[in-house]
Amino acid sequence: MADVYELFLTCPKGLESLLLEEAQGLGLDEARAQVSAVRGQGSLEVAYRLCLWSRLANRVLLVLARFPVENAESMYMAVHAVNWEDHLDAGGTLAVEFSGKGSGIDNTHFGALKVKDAIVDNLRERSGRRPSVDKVNPDVRVHLHLDRGQATLSLDLSGHSLHQRGYRLQQGAAPLKENLAAAVLIRAGWPKIAAEGGALADPMCGVGTFLVEAALMAADIAPNLKRERWGFSSWLGHVPALWRKLHEEAQQRAAAGLARPPLWIRGYEADPRLIQPACNNIERAGVADWVKIYQGELATFEPRPDKGQTGLVICNPPYGERLGDEASLLYLYQNLGERLRQSCIGWSAGVFTGAPELGKRMGIRSHKQYAFWNGALACKLLMIQVEPRQFVTGERGERNDEGLARAPSEPARLSEGGQMFANRLQKNLRQLGKWARRDKIECYRLYDADMPEYALAVDIYGDWVHVQEYAAPKSIDPAKAQARLFDALAAIPQTLGVAQERVVVKRRERQAGKKQYERQSSEGKFLEVGEGDVRLLVNLTDYLDTGLFLDHRPMRLRIQKEAAGKRFLNLFCYTATATVHAARGGARSTTSVDLSKTYLDWARRNLSLNGFSDKQRLVHGDVMEWLREDDGQYELIFIDPPTFSNSKRMEGVFDVQRDHVELLDLAMARLAPGGVLYFSNNFRKFELDESVQARYAVEEITGETLDPDFARNPKIHRAWRITVR
């Protein structure tokens, strides 16, 4: 065996420079960094120290050979030429990992198989015995990397990846790997802060990875001290006495570190389900005297160390994957900035984020940013010195008396565009607010893409705000579109005086196929709102639409005025809001037809909320099929079909432009003498067929069915009054 080995350390992308410094400190000579790795030379003792003490490496590989590869056979011969009796007992177990490609080897499974065959054949030829394969816990794990015709053959001394310290058996939804968490702490300056007796707090600690890694550093505990099985444990080149010496030395250092007065290291987590797993992880790591976890919301975060010392606030805020998460993320960062400004003066803060653009919403300048990768996600560590001179805040948004909630909102610093958007909201609120108060309207559209660069619809639902982002055209840079959305979301709470958590955001785009019916969420929260003298249920979170088409408000009120004593038919009834108005107006009976059981259940709730049930008929079925079979007569009919509709419960696809003639003919056959049919749809390119106008008395009433909040968008729908000639 050689006295000095070539050693190859792998690590996550972005940690190379930190690992280089760490490896040099542990004795690696001639060290140099490359992508996701550090290579150098060292003795077996250095290799052992790297395995035991590296907080950043994934694996420690001992290089056995480097050689050119022309084809699979030349690779086989080069691997076969290694004296494997120095490394593996012929009756032992083996695992082979292969990475890279080239020289006719484009399949890693095939490459690994050729390497395995070469090793097995070598040992069988020398001893008459052959090793078996064990992919989980082999005696020796061999790795071959092929890059541009050059192969590196290595032994994996670490075994399982070194980030697996053994303490984190329970984890949350999106945990950081332990070595990435350690790297973030090192970049954030924790080793120096800890050496000076400083404190550490994580306001969103999850299962406590930052906390444990911080305690291991502060107490001088080798990160892999408790690992029982190593890649070198059954390697024939292993020197147990040397390993025991280094392991005992690490145990003594850990004991000395834990004997010191513990630093103040605290974590706070809002999700009660994560508290016990976090405590279990801390206990397994052996740092329960150093680390404490408390359940607490970010809004109450206020670190107060026993001795009044400052230190480091470190956190990894969640990043959103679900449509509509933008608002909650924006407000989370604003709240984090608020807590830092109010409760952490004099502290350093490190915010590790996959959405660095949100860091600007904290209202504190970051003086340093470090690039990292969390798997395939590009991330940044934003370093902040929490001092008033670093604060960036704007003026508190002007409050209003338009009937919106008075919940205070921490003012966010608005960009120039964000301030323009806020100004437009205020202008619209002054104009529409008077009308809404006069007519006792709780729900209305405040803003509808008035400024093209802010392509949003902003709807008021009592003291809630429902925001729909229109999908940007492909010609628009997605990053710019997202930045504008964030500008708008920052402006809305302070301009309208609503609590941040009462702003709901969705993205509206052209619907296709089943997507029109997809749930956006599953919160199941219904909000009761008023429209005239009826109460209606809306759901702002679960579906793209809320259950109440605001643009049809005048039509519903017209139906209520005309319904007295009449039989009312509502086709494609959705949540039957028009039916509720008809019933309130004194309709003799109501019949509402829709293909969705979900919306019919919603309709039943709306009717029940207003005290209607027995006389109101709800029909689950395909409207066209139902009309062909129904023989009832109705004095008042309302039809507001979707642009298209498909379902496994109906044959074919309903297309309003193609099918409206048949639909209207079927419905007019059900119209009682002297009755009125109201027909509306929101297909912007819709043209009413001339044959309909020839057969019936048709009057377009679109202008009469638009209130001031939709006057800016006259194409939101079209409506007709149709009677028998």
Swiss-Prot record:
Location relative to the cell: Cytoplasm
One Pfam family this sequence matches: UPF0020
SMART domains cross-referenced by the UniProt entry: THUMP (SM00981)
Cysteine disulfide links: none
GO molecular function ontology, one term from the record: 23S rRNA (guanine(2445)-N(2))-methyltransferase activity
EC number: 2.1.1.173, 2.1.1.264
Keywords from the named record: Cytoplasm, Methyltransferase, RNA-binding, rRNA processing, S-adenosyl-L-methionine, Transferase
Superkingdom per UniProt: Bacteria
Substrates-to-products reaction catalysed: guanosine(2445) in 23S rRNA + S-adenosyl-L-methionine = N(2)-methylguanosine(2445) in 23S rRNA + S-adenosyl-L-homocysteine + H(+); guanosine(2069) in 23S rRNA + S-adenosyl-L-methionine = N(2)-methylguanosine(2069) in 23S rRNA + S-adenosyl-L-homocysteine + H(+)
Annotated HAMAP family: 23SrRNA_methyltr_KL (MF_01858)
Function of the molecule: Specifically methylates the guanine in position 2445 (m2G2445) and the guanine in position 2069 (m7G2069) of 23S rRNA.
The protein, known as: Ribosomal RNA large subunit methyltransferase K/L
